[in-house]
């Protein structure tokens, strides 16, 4: 959950957070990623100076304990990595078994993987092939950080490249172009499968030219992607009227799951069966028949994306008052949702009453104490 929150605060729109094993990820998304970063669990020898209690952990679970875990993670990461892609493997240990030895055995199993040259910061050291039996000279391209030579603790990292054509069509790119998966069936979104309505194609996928779009209405009169309508309900359509033409999303991008409006980062077909923590951008929620934009949406926008907005300076006391959840006053006479920005950067929402009073809508869990 902490990772999902950090991505929300960063305004990330195209990220998916799962709680899955590397093996299941590789089974679901083979050769899907162009970049893979492994922060491998390790014996932690490089952390002894900062946290002496790590010595007890090392005595209980030394390098021999972590080697099979790291081997399995590397194997699944290889399966996840697309041809022409790059992978970083890193640890916080000095152990050659977990560092150069791990990479040497991985390269022996996968001759299509090679070590890349990287630019070293001052004080960074090269890998130590002489520390293992049969170590290849290419292991010197690895990076070691020793606390007596560089600012920091003890670390190891290596950049690996997978041979192949990065532009080679894979199943996912074909699905993006045609809207049809490898099984010949049309790719649907989560809401299609749950019956709550959805987009016809992936939000960020390329739209194939000349393909007829299906009717935007269901037989029962519901709009796709927006679910049931109720008379007098404030729907997202009214909110979209305040979006400028520069906004990176439209009403058609929305799908709905129960009372939550989403912009999915991936088709649910692609991640079906995975334990999901976060599947994309939470656009907003239906609160007692009224649409409320999310805090994540505000942070994912630029100030020019929304017409009704105010821009405070960092020195303005109202910026702090807003972060504390207080009502603020301004010369903004708009009614409805107002985007609150500080020095040009969106921070969250208020709701105007048309007389300059802005009711605070900053997420309660994020407010300053």
Annotate the PLM regions.
Residues 86-90:
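Conserved beta-strand signature within the Rossmann-like core of class I S-adenosyl-L-methionine
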Residues 1-30:
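S-adenosyl-L-methionine
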Residues 81-83:
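Helix-to-beta-strand junctions that scaffold the AdoMet/dcAdoMet cofactor pocket
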Residues 34-75, 92-99:
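Mobile active-site "lid"/loop adjacent to the S-adenosyl-L-methionine
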Residues 32-34, 111:
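Local beta-strand N-terminus motif with an aromatic residue
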Residues 100-123:
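Conserved Class I S-adenosyl-L-methionine
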Residues 141-170, 174:
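Core SAM-dependent methyltransferase catalytic element
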Residues 163-369:
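Polybasic, low-complexity RNA-engagement segments
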